[in-house]
């Protein structure tokens, strides 16, 4: 079963992919066919009673210096995801 995963983490451009456990989780989730969307905690806000963020589709690869691609941001409610992964 494919899951739709939102991941809250530090800026992905600044991580060291060789030692980052969040990055390892993302690689495995992607390998298993799950959809991944990315946001940083400073972008969270409330819309009524919903927690929302500008989420970006995320593709990761095990290449130092070229380890991710982000899609266009779209403001979405976090309760629409199967999994919300908080990694800080």
Model-based region annotation:
Residues 1-88:
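ATP-binding N-terminal substructure of ATP-dependent carboxylate-amine bond-forming enzymes
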């Amino acid at each position: 079963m494919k899951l739709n995963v939102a991941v809250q983490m530090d800026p992905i451009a600044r991580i060291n992919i060789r030692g980052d456990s969040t990055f390892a989780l993302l690689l495995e989730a992607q390998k298993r066919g799950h959809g991944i969307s990315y946001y940083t905690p400073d972008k969270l806000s409330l819309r009524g009673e919903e927690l929302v963020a500008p989420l970006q589709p995320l593709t990761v690869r095990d290449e130092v210096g070229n380890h991710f691609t982000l899609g266009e941001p779209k403001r979405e409610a976090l309760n629409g995801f199967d999994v919300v992964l908080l990694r800080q």
